[in-house]
Amino acid sequence: MMDYDDARGERPRLLVVANRLPVSAKRTGENSWSLEMSPGGLVSGLLGITSQFDTKWVGWPGVDVHDEIEKNALTESLAEMKCIPVFLNGVFDQYYNGYCNGILWPILHHMGLPQEDQHDTNQTFETQYDAYKKANRMFLDVIIDNYEEGDIVWCHDYHLMFLPQYLKEYNNKIKVGWFLHSPFPSSEVYKTLPSRSELLRAILAADLLGFHTYDFARHFLSTCTRILGVEGTHEGVVYQGRVTRVAVFPIGIDPDRFIRTCKLPEVTQQMNELQEKFAGKKVILGVDRLDMIKGIPQKYLAFEKFLEENPYWRDKVVLVQIAVPTRNDVPEYRKLKSQVHGLVGRINGRFGSVSSLPIHHLDCSVDFNYLCAIYAIADVMLVTSLRDGMNLVSYEFVACQEAKKGVLVLSEFAGAGQSLGVGALIVNPWDVTEVSSAIKEALNMPAEERETRHRSNFQYVCTHSAEKWGLDFMSELNGIIPESEMQMRKIPLQLPEQDVIQQYSQSNNRLIILGFFGTLAEPMNSGTKEMDLKLNPELKGTLKALCNDPKTTVVVLSRSGKNILNKNFGESNIWLAAENGMFEKQTTGEWVTNMPQNVNLDWVDGVKNVFKYFTDRTPRSYFEASETSLVWNYEYADVEFGRAQARDLLQYLWAGPISNASVDVVRGNHSVEVHAIGETKGAAIGRILGEIVHRKSMTTPIDFVFCSGYFLEKDEDIYTFFESKILSSKSPNGLDLKKENYFSAAIGQARTKARYVIDSAHGVVDLLHKLAVVADTTMTDSFSDSEIYEPRDANANENSKRWINSVRRRKVEIGDTGQIGM
């Protein structure tokens, strides 16, 4: 067993956070409460880890308490049971009944959003969504009040999807796990949720995400890919520079509790009474909540068909259905109850008699002893869930069948279908003919086959208990954290903006190298193609200020063609490199080619035809052609379809136009690029650097380099080029670089050779504004604020404007070195 002792040699604390505490609280008098622990799968699941962890529960106590004195009294009583209450006064109804049960629950169970008046639905949704976020914040506040360094937090279910994000924002060192106890739907269903992206991002903040089945995990990964555009791997999801592990943990029950209960004298007596009541008949059992997803109407329709087609069994079988009431206050549930009662009346009327009824329907819950007794005497367990998380009723039935070895007929849409599929008869509950046939097969099954099937299921239920589930999850969470930290160490840190500004202000010869697409280009909407790239209008004055500073040289290095760069930078005092350096241009001079004399471009027309073919057959894809390269881009196409098309496209290319060509083929995140061999941004910048030193007749070495862009992996040699040039003293190559004055920053990429990362191009824009102000303060002819900073709207980049204004006010702090007092 894994040793979980923390650095202090003590058991680490585990905070188990769920919507509801596992305690029933009843007021027994003024400021006094009676508490009773509620048994269940989650409680059982944590029994095995209480010896490893000091476990405390956090959740709603199940009662509304408004008086502070009563709150304190209940809190003190709950503390004795290691429970910490979250009082959700004022938000519970909108949070729980509204958003959780009215929005998330139907979506997760493939039922879709409520179909009501659109105007009312929008208003209601916003109110419920706000209450949901507020409730998650209230959980956070309670956790913060009780958090101790080193605590592990395990969040449960869809009620708390924002909590992992809130916890990491509070302290990103907290170990956070999140487990979903319901299904996760296909991406086509999930994407109808208005808050779809926000919820996905929030739970991806956790270190470990757990699901009941591989299907649920697969749907989640596919949804992350389609909605967030991230890659799902066998490890999980890499998002915003961190790894979130996604794994499968099928929950179980406490089988020993059921086995022990079946042997109690009072339960044995109940079993005898039930067998006497149903003497001479086979008993088919159903135990479900009266809920739309449980498929009770489908169960009755299949049973009706069975009785129609098998007259022999009409007086020899009885279906006992325990339908536990749930939400009688909801119209849909009242309608379901009426429908179920109608079916019971119809079937009993058709096939019943004065002395015998084929269906015994109970609209109530039963005590645990009676439940075990009826599980034990049943011949067949019939589970027809239309969509379910795990459905532990099937596990409970198996645990109680040690003597009788009855048959389990199980819906393929219940999570247990993937665990108990070997021993159960798996059915599609929507196919009443298939379910009817399965009932007949179960009733007629030979004893030897029943024994074999039961043995398989019984072994699984006993070895995959709730206790094992809890241990497995915590073992994975504790094992994945060091791995996550190791991954984080491989992932560069955020760019230290203040260090960049400080080094820039102290330097005398600065070099700034920037990409165009995804860096300086105007942010694109879904209808824009890369052929239409335009310089971000906020940067026009900024680049002008930087380029006119005699101490600063700016280079734009792009895969785009000469015409695009001319159109955007033609009038700037800037160095340009088109098609990854195949062509370069000094400020207002002429383009110079670096293309080898013997380069063969006969492949271009053939590749262009293949790209055109796939563009026509991949909606929202496009391709860009330049003199030495072509790029097919499917960034705005359906992600999975685009990837499949890209695989086919590559096969077409290798089989045809590039089979014998000297080209490089680069597979990007959402693109395929074919270009003349041998040219990369790293090779280009070495040549451009030599030209800069020569043409500017530099006498002072370059003592500051900032290099940033949204580059393909093969072009990241531009970062390693400068790493190799970092020297302890001035060198003849025109560089005087040290670790402290070289800054490379990849934009929005978790895996990179750059030293640092920037979340988005907005961060680069913001930094360039600030560097332009520093450059402006050291020049005689200063630009106006509006020339340097040209926001597209009045509210854009308020932080940048405040910083710029503060520097304007502090010009007196700038000395001869140009250093700004920070």
Curated annotation (Swiss-Prot):
Keyword Glycosyltransferase attributed: yes
UniProt-annotated stretches for the region Glycosyltransferase: 12-479
Reaction catalyzed: D-glucose 6-phosphate + UDP-alpha-D-glucose = alpha,alpha-trehalose 6-phosphate + UDP + H(+)
EC number: 2.4.1.15
Entry superkingdom: Eukaryota
Keywords: Glycosyltransferase, Transferase
BP terms from Gene Ontology: trehalose biosynthetic process
Glycosyltransferase in keyword set: yes
Enzyme class (EC, first level): transferase
Family: In the N-terminal section; belongs to the glycosyltransferase 20 family. In the C-terminal section; belongs to the trehalose phosphatase family.
Record-linked PANTHER family: ALPHA,ALPHA-TREHALOSE-PHOSPHATE SYNTHASE [UDP-FORMING] 2-RELATED, TREHALOSE-6-PHOSPHATE SYNTHASE
Protein name, as recorded: Probable alpha,alpha-trehalose-phosphate synthase [UDP-forming] 2
Protein's organism: Arabidopsis thaliana (Mouse-ear cress)
Gene: TPS2
